[in-house]
């Protein structure tokens, strides 16, 4: 509000640090050369630029097609960007695990929601790869050797954190000791869902001792006492609001994860049909079998019980 009798026009708070009473003088045509385009900084010889901050040079220099085929660049970038999204998903899941252990659930909700959005990005990425035809893929496939997404150690850690444990999946990484050790630690640690079940016990729900002291290297299996606890939560959500919200965040997460897996299968079938995968898996049949994996079984079964 202007003081009484003050006829000066109000200044925009974002107008910069010019003197308030200075008259506006149009800039000369050549002023942009000296002051920067629309006052933007143009000289980064002494300061950090966008490319410096993001380390773009090594990232954009990390694509090395092995074939003369035009479409290999798409194949490489598709998988590299997926690995970057998985890096973010793992970063958020580790933070969510720590928050759940500390009974700090609101931050965990935000992190889990973000992971679900990351998975949506990964689902959409298959649409780009699906522009590659079977003929185009066949031209570059011999250059892939035995490399396969099956060997992605970030994907394997993601599966382990979400509870789909399988010690045999360590073997493809035996030639890289540091990665093997990292994955083995993830295999032996409680999964995200294991920590949520511990949370249920801390909130007073009677969870079977053998479930709370389970062999963490084994995949998640349905437990009656866990389903009974979730049933109580869903029947009185207002009395257990944080647990109710946690349950729904987990369902959102698994829903998105299933969609990612399904889109993977359909893209593979579209491009290579039912040929053997480059990593010697059965290809599409192997991926279809993975669609049957249920990460949080009680949360799905309780919907029938309600």
UniProtKB/Swiss-Prot annotation:
Pfam families: Trp_dioxygenase
Annotated GO MF terms: heme binding; metal ion binding; tryptophan 2,3-dioxygenase activity
EC number: 1.13.11.11
Chain spans, region Disordered: 1-29
Enzyme class: oxidoreductase
Top-level taxon of origin: Bacteria
Positions with a binding annotation for heme: 264
Record key words, sorted: Dioxygenase, Heme, Iron, Metal-binding, Oxidoreductase, Tryptophan catabolism
Sites where the protein binds substrate: 75-79, 137, 141, 278
Cofactor note: Binds 1 heme group per subunit.
Gene Ontology biological process: L-tryptophan catabolic process to acetyl-CoA; L-tryptophan catabolic process to kynurenine
Cofactors that this protein relies on: heme
Reactions catalysed according to its record: L-tryptophan + O2 = N-formyl-L-kynurenine
Pathway involvement of the protein, from the record: Amino-acid degradation; L-tryptophan degradation via kynurenine pathway; L-kynurenine from L-tryptophan: step 1/2
Quaternary structure and interacting proteins, as annotated: Homotetramer.
Function, in words: Heme-dependent dioxygenase that catalyzes the oxidative cleavage of the L-tryptophan (L-Trp) pyrrole ring and converts L-tryptophan to N-formyl-L-kynurenine. Catalyzes the oxidative cleavage of the indole moiety.
Family statement drawn from the similarity comment of this UniProt entry: Belongs to the tryptophan 2,3-dioxygenase family.
HAMAP family linked to this entry: T23O (MF_01972)
PANTHER family: TRYPTOPHAN 2,3-DIOXYGENASE (PTHR10138:SF0)
Entry protein name: Tryptophan 2,3-dioxygenase
């Amino acid at each position: 509000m202007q003081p009484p009798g003050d006829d000066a026009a109000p200044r925009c708070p974002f107008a910069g640090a010019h003197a308030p009473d200075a008259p506006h003088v149009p800039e000369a045509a050549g002023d942009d050369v000296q002051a920067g385009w629309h006052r933007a900084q143009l000289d980064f010889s002494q300061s950090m630029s966008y490319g410096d901050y993001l380390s773009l040079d090594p990232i954009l220099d990390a694509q090395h097609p092995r074939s003369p085929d035009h479409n290999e660049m798409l194949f490489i970038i598709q998988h590299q960007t997926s690995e970057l999204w998985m890096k973010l998903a793992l970063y958020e899941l580790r933070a969510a695990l720590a928050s759940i252990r500390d009974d700090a659930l609101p931050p965990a909700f935000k992190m889990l929601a973000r992971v679900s959005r990351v998975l949506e990005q990964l689902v959409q990425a298959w649409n780009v790869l699906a522009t590659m035809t079977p003929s185009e893929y066949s031209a570059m496939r011999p250059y892939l050797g035995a490399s396969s997404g099956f060997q992605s150690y970030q994907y394997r850690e993601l599966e382990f954190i979400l509870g789909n444990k399988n010690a045999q999946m360590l073997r493809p990484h035996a030639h890289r000791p540091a990665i093997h050790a990292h994955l083995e630690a993830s295999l032996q640690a409680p999964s995200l869902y294991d920590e949520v079940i511990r949370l249920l016990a801390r909130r007073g729900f009677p969870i079977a001792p053998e479930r709370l002291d389970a062999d963490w290297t084994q995949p998640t299996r349905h437990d009656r006492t866990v389903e009974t606890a979730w049933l109580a939560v869903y029947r009185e959500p207002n009395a257990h609001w944080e647990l109710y919200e946690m349950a729904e965040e987990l369902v959102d997460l698994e829903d998105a994860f299933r969609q990612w897996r399904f889109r993977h299968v359909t893209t593979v079938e579209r491009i290579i049909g039912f040929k053997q995968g480059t990593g010697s898996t059965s290809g599409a049949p192997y991926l279809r079998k993975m669609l049957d994996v249920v990460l949080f079984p009680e949360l799905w079964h309780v919907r029938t019980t309600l």
